[in-house]
Structures are given as C-alpha cells and as structure tokens.
Amino acid sequence: MSDMAMIRIGILIAGLLLVAAIFLFGRPKKSPQGRRVDKGEGQPRERREPVISSEFGAEGDAAERAEGVEQSELNLEGQDASGGNEVGKRPNQDFDKIVSLFVAAKAGQVLRGEDVVVVAEKTGLVFGHMNVFHRLVEGHPERGPIFSMASILKPGSFDMANIREMQTPAIAFFLTLPAPMTALDAWEKMLPTVQRMAELLDGVVLDDSRNALGRQRVAHIRDELRAYDRQHQAPPLTKSPRW
C-alpha cells in the first residue's frame, strides 16, 4: 500500500468522530455557560480539508497507520439528513457523550460493502435512518438505536444501489448517550457485535484513539460508563419524616 493511501486512511479515521457527531446524531447539548459564536457562523464558508500533524511510516498495521493524525473539521454542508427511513432515528437529537469503536481492514486490504452488509445483518443490525445500520431494542424500535454503524468514507452512509462497488478502509460504531438503556448495558451489546464483525470481516478492532482494542482499554471504558450511569441515575426517593 502506498504512503498516500495510508495517509488517506488516517485522515478519514481521524475525522470520523466529528462526522458522526454532526451527520448522524445532531448537536450536543449546550453547556450551562453557552458557547462563543463566531461572526461568520451560519454563513457559507470555504471548505477546510483535514491536515496531518505528523508523518506516516511505510509499514505497520491499521492502528499504526492511524497514529499521529490530528482531528480537524470536515465539510458536511449540503448533506441530506433525511436519507433512508425512520428506523433507528433517535427520539431526541441531543447527546452528551459518544463512545466509538472501529473495525479496520488489515494492511493492504479493504472492506467490501457487500460483505459489510451481509455481516451486519448476521449480527443483528438493521438498515435504517441516515442509510446506516443500527442495533435496536428488541420489540421497541421507537426508542432509538442502542448503537449505530457507518462507513468512515464521507458521507458515512451505505448506498445500497451501488453496494457491490463500495469499498472502505474501515467502519465505525457509535454508542451515543443517553441511550435507550443504561450506558454499560449498551456497551455490552456493542462490544461483542464489533468483535464478531471484525472476526467475520477479517479486520482489526480499534478504539477511539485508533489503537488496537485491548483488555485494559475495555476495562477503562466500562469504568467510565459505570460512572456515567451513576451520574445520570434517578435520585433516590426520600422518606417522609414521621410526625
């Protein structure tokens, strides 16, 4: 694989978190202090391409090729937000946390769109809102996705009419919180699905830093999600004082 191809893979993976946050799930909740608004916000602006903060080596696996990439803004203007159907649409577009994983092709290989679709269906994902795949709560699709899966190639969707021609260096999985179940339970649904898809596609599971997902990182994510659940659980009811 050429250096240019590896650079492109790194750029796409680095920018995908922002793609998912804006393209798939709307806008994050506003902080209590609000945010600073630039003068030119809301106006047409010049396209800004991702940049590379360090050089890539000529060898290494998918994780190593993605090292050293600095996340930057991708242009999503003009994308159709109504693609696909309503299956997997979040009831509320606000979110406050995203947990992501990737399945990347091994060095010198790509993931074929047709294979991705077959494996997604085998692992219980359904095609729906935004033309991407979702894991839904069984019997309650109206509650929205437990997690979603998209291609890292812009715009992230799967064009079923041309799926046989589609190739992508990686696919991304997003657990967007709050979810229709506890954060930890949602993670326990997503992780084995990602691992199984990686096995069937002969790919590599990467974490949100584009490193190979290991036990220590999994344990750390579980701890983070336990803390999130504690923070967002309903406060206990106080007992009425005896008179």
UniProtKB/Swiss-Prot annotation:
Main location per the UniProt record: membrane
Q: Which residues lie on this side of the membrane: Cytoplasmic?
A: 26-243
Segments traversing the membrane = 5-25
Which is a Gene Ontology cellular component entry for this protein?
plasma membrane
Subunit description: Interacts with FtsZ via their C-terminal domains.
Q: Where in the cell is it found?
A: Cell inner membrane
Report what the protein is called: Cell division protein ZipA
> Membrane side Periplasmic: which residues?
1-4
Bilayer topology term: Single-pass type I membrane protein
Query: What's this chain's function?
Result: Essential cell division protein that stabilizes the FtsZ protofilaments by cross-linking them and that serves as a cytoplasmic membrane anchor for the Z ring. Also required for the recruitment to the septal ring of downstream cell division proteins.
Which family is this sequence assigned to? Belongs to the ZipA family.
One GO BP annotation of this record: division septum assembly
* Stretches the record annotates as Disordered: 30-89
Native organism: Xanthomonas axonopodis pv. citri (strain 306)
| Compositional bias per record (Basic and acidic residues), positions renumbered to this chain | 35-50
Question: SMART domains annotated for this entry?
Answer: ZipA_C
What are the entry keywords? Cell cycle, Cell division, Cell inner membrane, Cell membrane, Membrane, Transmembrane, Transmembrane helix
Gene behind this chain?
A: zipA
